[in-house]
């Protein structure tokens, strides 16, 4: 459970002032913070004449530096809960987002705790990429005086489960750090593991660190600490789906929907760059198929989080059915003694491949068995919400939120299958129907504070979504900064998402440049990374003029290919080798001039 962030209306500072104050005090020791506090007290309470001050005996209190490296918000919530636990224990703690951490100070850390998620092919979350690169570079310092602990969040449906946490843990040890605790790797259902780990961290730190006076306990963080809303992941807003429009052509191989959701008078606020969390209901037809394959009826009572529910209801609302994992396959094979699946158990690569290509219902179809209802429930993972990059700005749409949804559809031996959340939004929620949503704030994907700063946006496919939000915001504010969009998809006539809007922005001068890559409209495939290389000289001029670069879309292939192209452009037109170009791009990332929202 996290402690609610302070209501901005009750703070004497505005968000920008609060952010500057936090940035200015991040690196201060407790003694320095105490001095600054006394200094400001003296400014507010001037006295005439000399005042004798009795010095307070200096007390050395090792500070616990707590780094949150989050992609979807889960790692941040765990870190915030640990911060609250440490403060309650009167321990001196500084909480900082990985993107705000000045990693060159890591050599001076005495007590370091990292809570991290993993994205893509085992990569660190975006806000931790620079720190990760630094630790794995030749510049990384020895850490013989640092004691550390790592909590890693992941998803066993991915091959490189918790790889980011494994990387940080092994590298900190390799650099000479002392493990306070063994690393914990947590799956999607991480809450219980996180709660136990937090208690252990508090215990071990209390045994090592002198207790700080409560008045000297300090917690700092990024600007997202000031976000507050009565609607959260665990208490979502029941909103109304008002528009469901297919925005790909009749002959397109893709089914992409423009979804508009009415937030009513909820007061729910978001910024360009944020994501919308959507809770969904599994397809009742899929539930019926799975239940019948296991020779069950659906009305069998099962226990879910201490409550008794009918099996069908539990499957529809509480468990993941459309994403299989290696753990589920292994457990099902062991439980049923399946002759076809047991040989996979000893082969990690084959097991992972099978899970990635065979939905749960088809695993049961191909390897039938009879399970009781509770055994089935115990086999599955809890349902989790899906996050979609927001494609609108409230400066234009007010009490609405828009998202761009690529509907997942495929066949398994002639049987139609679909993604859980995307098909729920596209096929099963009627217009004016209810949908449970919340805002996942993303302060690592924000427009420049200076409206005159040029912006380069790279977003193929549904990665276009946040840039629609960006342009709505910049158009509404009438900003003068230049905007350049790189977009790509298979076909111009079928897959040009929001075509009329982009053309209008070009005509109005809001969008300064647009480069389009259609991969299937000619013999040679052309992608956005090819357009980046083609426009390399002009791209470098924009970067030299202070442009911010944004990338959104597929993490597995596109993001890596785009980064490679950017490095080549920087090396060629910046007159440097690839290693120097990589350092240059890392500096842009640290300066928040290179931001990615990849998934």
Swiss-Prot record:
HAMAP family, A to Z: CysJ (MF_01541)
Biological function: Component of the sulfite reductase complex that catalyzes the 6-electron reduction of sulfite to sulfide. This is one of several activities required for the biosynthesis of L-cysteine from sulfate. The flavoprotein component catalyzes the electron flow from NADPH -> FAD -> FMN to the hemoprotein component.
InterPro entries membership: CysJ (IPR010199), CysJ-like_FAD-binding (IPR003097), CysJ_Proteobact (IPR029758), FAD-bd_FR_type (IPR017927), Flavdoxin-like (IPR001094), Flavodoxin/NO_synth (IPR008254), Flavoprot_Pyr_Nucl_cyt_Rdtase (IPR001709), Flavoprotein-like_sf (IPR029039)
GO cellular component, as recorded: cytosol
Residues that, per the record, bind FMN: 70-75, 117-120, 153-162
Gene giving rise to this polypeptide: cysJ
Cofactors: FAD; FMN
Subunit organization: Alpha(8)-beta(8). The alpha component is a flavoprotein, the beta component is a hemoprotein.
Keywords: Amino-acid biosynthesis, Cysteine biosynthesis, Electron transport, FAD, Flavoprotein, FMN, NADP, Oxidoreductase, Transport
Molecular-function GO terms, alphabetical: flavin adenine dinucleotide binding; FMN binding; oxidoreductase activity; sulfite reductase (NADPH) activity
Keyword Magnesium applies: no
Protein name in the entry: Sulfite reductase [NADPH] flavoprotein alpha-component
Cofactor info, note text: Binds 1 FAD per subunit.
Domain of life of the native organism: Bacteria
